[in-house]
């Protein structure tokens, strides 16, 4: 059973179609792209047998610089446009809480399994937001509401740039 009702997404390459995202939500989608790159980098690091401490450092850095400010945007800017009891609102909050807990666990003590759980959850969470939550918002919110979201996102940008020097994910065997 997946935690907090998280639905895994299984699909073949033939079923994947690019999503035409509203310009109002594109800043969040760009950040999601960075999140998927994080997932790929951690998986590559695990595959390359990168030292757990190095993965912990990178995860902590990515949390502070990308995930935490991104969660702020979603929780303080998007969620007010959904009723607190809406299933998608509850799922977003629950998944954010679970990701936070995993990152705190990794910060204290981590093993490879913790990283696998984290990247699987982040990937599933991003897919939920892109394929369900954002589509719902685009279909149900007014142009005025969407513009308000966009303006708030512009006031609280998350830097979508990589400032991590050790590219452990590119190494054959990182130690």
Residue ranges of predicted features:
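Small-residue-biased structural context
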Residues: 3-175
């Amino acid at each position: 059973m997946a935690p907090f009702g998280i639905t895994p997404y299984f699909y073949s390459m033939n079923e994947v179609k690019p999503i035409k995202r509203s310009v109002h939500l594109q800043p969040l989608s760009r950040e999601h792209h960075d999140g998927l790159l994080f997932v790929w980098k951690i998986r590559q690091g695990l595959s390359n047998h990168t030292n757990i401490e190095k993965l912990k450092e990178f995860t902590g850095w990515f949390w502070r610089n990308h995930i935490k400010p991104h969660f702020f945007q979603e929780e303080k800017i998007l969620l007010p446009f959904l009723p607190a009891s809406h299933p998608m609102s509850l799922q977003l909050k629950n998944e954010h809480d679970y990701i936070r807990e995993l990152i705190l666990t990794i910060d204290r003590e981590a093993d490879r399994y913790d990283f696998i759980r984290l990247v699987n959850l982040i990937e599933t969470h991003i897919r939920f937001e892109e394929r369900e939550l954002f589509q719902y918002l685009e279909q149900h919110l007014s142009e005025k509401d969407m513009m308000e979201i966009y303006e708030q996102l512009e006031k609280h940008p998350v830097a979508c740039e990589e400032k991590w020097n050790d590219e452990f994910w590119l190494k054959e065997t990182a130690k």
